[in-house]
């Protein structure tokens, strides 16, 4: 098995449990250069809120930094942005879906920043 298949296999039990809970899901995806965060509806059929390091506003804030989209500072900024957008959409309670990634580094930085900005999970 390759790394992607293994990671997705690790994510299955978490996603199954979140589906049973019936709450919005904060899903995280990280690539080598960028990080993405989506809040998905309880039915799992639509993205309610999203934020990533590809957004123009985020790119201007990160301009001049080395590894601009792929570091913990960028992940923390995305966590804060997704939490602010979620609160504006009336969402406070979510379940955290790390998508099979270890809860460490950029994933942890995003989660901590989202909690500090007011999301509950």
UniProtKB/Swiss-Prot annotation:
The signal peptide annotation in the UniProt record is none
One GO term describing the cellular component: cytosolic large ribosomal subunit
- Superkingdom, taxonomy of origin: Bacteria
Q: Which GO terms describe its molecular function?
A: 5S rRNA binding; structural constituent of ribosome
Q: Which one Pfam family would you cite for this protein?
A: Ribosomal_L18p
Record Gene3D superfamilies: 3.30.420.100
Q: What GO terms in the biological process aspect are recorded for it?
A: translation
Task: Kindly give the SUPFAM superfamilies that the UniProt entry links to this protein.
Answer: Translational machinery components
Swiss-Prot/TrEMBL keywords: Ribonucleoprotein, Ribosomal protein, RNA-binding, rRNA-binding
Among InterPro entries, the record links this protein to: Ribosomal_uL18_bac-type, Ribosomal_uL18_bac/euk
Q: Which PANTHER family match?
A: 39S RIBOSOMAL PROTEIN L18, MITOCHONDRIAL, LARGE RIBOSOMAL SUBUNIT PROTEIN UL18M
Q: How does it assemble?
A: Part of the 50S ribosomal subunit; part of the 5S rRNA/L5/L18/L25 subcomplex. Contacts the 5S and 23S rRNAs.
What is this protein's function? This is one of the proteins that bind and probably mediate the attachment of the 5S RNA into the large ribosomal subunit, where it forms part of the central protuberance.
Q: What is this protein called?
A: Large ribosomal subunit protein uL18
Name of the coding gene: rplR
